[in-house]
Design a protein with these regions (language model features):
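Gram-negative bacterial Sec-dependent N-terminal signal peptides
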Residues: 1-22
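Low-complexity, acidic/polar, glycine-enriched regions of mature
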Residues: 20-192
Length: 192
C-alpha cells in the first residue's frame, strides 16, 4: 500500500509540474481588442488614423519556456476611420480589396521575452493576398485575474511599421503619399 501511495504521489507531482509548465491559451476579447493604424495623407499634410472593429484570434503563451504563438484574423470590411466615404474607398481594389481579400491575418510563430515579460512577436502579416514578415514590438504587457469573469486576462500594447506598397497597396504614391504605415494593437486575451 505504501508503494502505491508513493507511485500515486509521484504521478500527481509529475502531473502538476507538467501543467505548471504547459502553455496557456488566451482567446482575444473582441470588445477589448483594437487593431488600428496611422498612414500618411499627401506627403505629410496630415495623418489618417483608423481601426478595425472586428477581429478574432488566440495567443498561446508558454512563460516557463519563454515563447509562444499568435494567430489573429481581422475583418478588413470593418475598417473605421470616422469617415464613411474614406472607409468605402479603403475597401476598394486599390487598397484592401475587401471583396477579394476579406481578411488580414497575422501569424506569430514565436514570442521573444525580456526577462519574464513578452517583448516581441516574430511573425508574418498576410494582407491583400501578400504575406510578408512583420514583427510586433510589445510596448506593455500585464495580466490579472478579472474579478467579474474570475479568469486571468492579459492585456498588451504592440506596434509595428511596414510599407503598404509591399502588400500591393500603393495608391497615392504618385501624389506623394508616403507608404509607411504604423500598426498599433491594443488587445486583451482571456485565459481558456
Amino acid at each position: 500500500m505504501k508503494k502505491f501511495s508513493m507511485i500515486a504521489a509521484g504521478a500527481l507531482a509529475a502531473g502538476l509540474s507538467f501543467s505548471a509548465m504547459a502553455a496557456d491559451t488566451y482567446q482575444l476579447d473582441p470588445n477589448h481588442t483594437y487593431p488600428s493604424f496611422e498612414a500618411d495623407h499627401f506627403g505629410g499634410v496630415s495623418t489618417w488614423r483608423g481601426k478595425f472593429n472586428k477581429s478574432s484570434g488566440t495567443v498561446v503563451l508558454d512563460r516557463a519556456a519563454k515563447t509562444g504563438t499568435m494567430d489573429v484574423t481581422i475583418d478588413v470590411s470593418s475598417i473605421n476611420t470616422g469617415n464613411a466615404k474614406l472607409d468605402e474607398h479603403l475597401q476598394k481594389a486599390e487598397f484592401f480589396d475587401a471583396a477579394k481579400y476579406p481578411t488580414a491575418v497575422y501569424k506569430g510563430t514565436s514570442i521573444r521575452f525580456d526577462g519574464d515579460k513578452p517583448a516581441e512577436v516574430v511573425g508574418s502579416l498576410t494582407m491583400h493576398g501578400v504575406t510578408k514578415p512583420l514583427n510586433l514590438k510589445i510596448e506593455s504587457f500585464k495580466c490579472f485575474v478579472n474579478p467579474m469573469m474570475k479568469k486571468e486576462v492579459c492585456g498588451t500594447e504592440a506596434t509595428a511599421t511596414f510599407d503598404r506598397g509591399d502588400f500591393g497597396m500603393d495608391y497615392g504614391k504618385t501624389y506623394g503619399f508616403s507608404l509607411k504605415t504604423v500598426l498599433h494593437i491594443q488587445a486583451e486575451g482571456v485565459k481558456q
